[in-house]
Amino acid sequence: MQATALSSGFNPLTKRKDHRFPRSCSQRNSLSLIQCDIKERSFGESMTITNRGLSFKTNVFEQARSVTGDCSYDETSAKARSHVVAEDKIGVLLLNLGGPETLNDVQPFLYNLFADPDIIRLPRPFQFLQGTIAKFISVVRAPKSKEGYAAIGGGSPLRKITDEQADAIKMSLQAKNIAANVYVGMRYWYPFTEEAVQQIKKDKITRLVVLPLYPQYSISTTGSSIRVLQDLFRKDPYLAGVPVAIIKSWYQRRGYVNSMADLIEKELQTFSDPKEVMIFFSAHGVPVSYVENAGDPYQKQMEECIDLIMEELKARGVLNDHKLAYQSRVGPVQWLKPYTDEVLVDLGKSGVKSLLAVPVSFVSEHIETLEEIDMEYRELALESGVENWGRVPALGLTPSFITDLADAVIESLPSAEAMSNPNAVVDSEDSESSDAFSYIVKMFFGSILAFVLLLSPKMFHAFRNL
């Protein structure tokens, strides 16, 4: 699927301005067929780039815990140095969602979001409707979304926090004797990924590590950003020759798991009776069709992530009950269950009095933590019978977390391959086309149903309240 200026995240409703180029964070795998190494073993899940987009090959480690062994700087940096020549100019590209910085940015930001074919997945014959649907949803949702952003100060803090994370990662790499330029590329708002890539080219980077700031892989987050990068790199002769490694997911890294456990353990101590607190993981949801029809590994990785964190807490003597639910569903389709709002009501009614919310999909504070969790879900929980509410902060600039991301960058350097490498591109069918006729039929009638629902007064009202 060829990315266009629209689907690549450029804002068609505002003029381009000069913006500085911040930087971004970590995730595993590649624009080419790349596997990262830890202690001589391949890491994570292998992904290939095809003429039609991303395609999963194999899950190298079914059990995430098999790759969470401790990694020391001495091992990883020495290994990286043995593969990276002294003349290499290293770049690190941190990828993130982006967010409106003012209330006037909200509607065009939402347009960019819903114009992404990885967010609203239409069959190819109907992709000409993408912009129309995106325009409708963004206009309908903008008033309610503006209320949310107004409640947290008038805009998203995501860019500022991501810039700070980029600076911290750069300093951590310098402390490990790795000189690198660190860039930030946002998917749906400034600084767009395209801007960061142009700066990478201008700076003549000769080896690049791409680090999405999403611990778990999803088609709608890391996958969408990689699709844009794939298109940009293939079209540019210079970029096509730059060795690139992508850290596609990193939820199973020991540093990440320990950092999450540290924050949870610390917040539990703020309760009068820490042992009685329900640990409530709230993850960003995705449509069920992504998992069942498109092969998105997000749900599996999220469940493995929670298992790893709880195992670490158990090893520390923290034996609290826990629950996982999914938030932020949009529209009439089925999303991953259970839903956060419904579970909170059930927990309150069942007698849970103390609850600690853990935003497990997010490494930065933004609208879904500051407004959705801290305001909407907190109020709902208290109304439902929960008496003591707490929330674990996003990882942000937690030193152990930043150090681990820097280590992930160092470990991935040897695996970088140029896009022009013929072995780096494998022409295989993606999961959508395994039964193309059936898929198109389903999506055609699904699209008709979606339009009927969207245009009905009841559905219009529902979208205004999302």
Curated annotation (Swiss-Prot):
Recorded metabolic or biological pathway in which this protein acts: Porphyrin-containing compound metabolism; protoheme biosynthesis; protoheme from protoporphyrin-IX: step 1/1
UniProt-listed Enzyme Commission number(s): 4.98.1.1
The entry's keywords: Chloroplast, Heme biosynthesis, Iron, Lyase, Membrane, Mitochondrion, Plastid, Porphyrin biosynthesis, Thylakoid, Transit peptide
Deleted gene: phenotype: No visible phenotype, but decreased heme content in roots.
Lipid bilayer topology: Peripheral membrane protein
InterPro entries noted in UniProt: Ferrochelatase, Ferrochelatase_AS, Ferrochelatase_C, Ferrochelatase_N
SUPFAM superfamilies xrefs: Chelatase
Presence of the UniProt keyword Membrane in the record: yes
Molecular function via GO: ferrochelatase activity
Name of the protein in its database record: Ferrochelatase-1, chloroplastic/mitochondrial
Classification lineage: Eukaryota, Viridiplantae, Streptophyta, Embryophyta, Tracheophyta
